[in-house]
Amino acid sequence: MQRSLFVALAALGVSLLGPQVAQAQAIIDCVPKGNARPICAFSNPEDMVALPGGQAILIGEYGASAQTTGKLLVFELESEEQRTVYRGGQSQSAAEPGWGDPACTTPPDERFNSHGIDLVRRDDGRLQLLVIQHGSREAIELFEVMGSGTDWRVEWRGCVPAPANASLNSVAAISNGDFYTTQSTPLEPPVDFSKSMPREITGHVYAWSQADKSFRKVGGTDGAVPNGIVTSPDGRYIYMTATGEHSVRKVEVATGREVGRATVDTPDNARWTADGRVLIASLARDLTGEDLGACVSIEQGACSIPFKIVVLDPQSMTIVETLYATDGAPMGAGTVGLRVGDELFIGSYHGDRILRVNLQGQ
C-alpha cells in the first residue's frame, strides 16, 4: 500500500466518511474460516520476508504518524510468539562502510516507520535487510540480520536517502549491494486518491548502485502508482506492479525494454516462491477513495476489502493460479503473500492481524 494514499486517507478519515461507514468495514471477530486462521496480535503488518531455516518470518509493521510509528518484529512459526527486534531511536550502532550512502551516518530516530522490506544474502555472506522508511526521513534503511532458527536480531548499518521528492514504496535487493525501489508518487504536489486510484503516470522505478552511490531512473517503468517489486537473482529483470494500471510488468533493466505484462486487479506487493514463481497480492479491482478511507479509519479489527493472492509465471507472464481469495472475514485488504513450505502468510496495510493459510494439498 502506497504511503501517500495511506496518509491522505488517514487524514480524511471518519470526518469524510462517517463513523458508521468505518465501522461497517471492520472485521472484529478473530476466528478461522476454512483453511485460513487469523493471528490477531499485530499493528498494520504491511510486509514480510522469510528468514533462513523456515522457522520464523520477519514482519514490518507500518505506522502512519508520530502516534503510530512502525517497527520490525520476528514471528516464530511454531510457538506463534513475536518479538520486536527494532524500534526507532534505540540503535547505538554507527554506519558501516559498504552499507549504503557514506553521507548517512546516524540511525533512525523514534519516528522510524517501516514500509516495504526485502532480505538478501550479500556477496560477503552477511544478511542484509532493506526497509523503506518514511518517519524520520525518506530513505532506505539498511540492517544486518544475525542469528538462526528462531533467535534473530538486527543491527542498523547504514541508509540511502531517497531521491528528491520521491515517496517510495517497495524495494528489491541484489547480492552485490545494488537495489531497485518503486516511487509510487511524488511527495509534492500530492496525488489525489480521494475518488479513485489514479490512472495517470505518478512514478517509476529507481536503480541504486553501490559502486556509484547514486540513483538512476529505470527506463520502461513509468506507471500509475508503481508499488511492489522483485528482481531476478542476477538483477537483469525487474517485475513491477502498477496498482493504478492493474498490471505487472517485466522490464529488462539495462535497456528499459518491457518483456511482458500480466493483468492483475489492483496489485500490491510481490514475493518470490521457492519454486521460482511470483506471488502477487491483488485487491478488488474497482476500489474507491471511500473504500480505502474506511479501512484506514478502523481503530479495531481488520479491514474487509476483498483480495486474493495470485501466482505469476515469470517466464510466460501469465497468472497460473489463485492461491487464496476472500471477501470479508477473517481478514481483508491483504497486501503481501509469503509462502513458507505448505503455508501462506498474508499481511495487511491496516489492521490487527495476519492470516496463516494451510496449503496442504494445493
Predicted features and spans:
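Blade-level signature of beta-propeller repeat domains, shared across WD40, Kelch, NHL, RCC1
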Residues: A333-Q362
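Loop/turn-rich, solvent-exposed surfaces of beta-rich toroidal or solenoidal domains
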Residues: V264-L323
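Short loop/turn segments that connect beta-strands within beta-propeller blades
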Residues: E76-E80, V145-G149, W208-K213, E252-G256, ...
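Beta-rich, blade/repeat-based domains predominating
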Residues: F42-G53, T68-T69, S91-R121, W156, ...
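Beta-propeller domains
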Residues: L58-S93
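Short, conserved, GDST-rich strand-edge loop motifs in beta-rich repeat architectures
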Residues: I59-G70, V131-I132, T181-E200, A281-S304
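A short helix->beta-strand "capping" segment at the edge of beta-propeller domains
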Residues: Q25-N44, W99-P102, V154, V320-A325
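Blade/loop signatures of beta-propeller domains
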Residues: A24-K33, E200, K308, D313
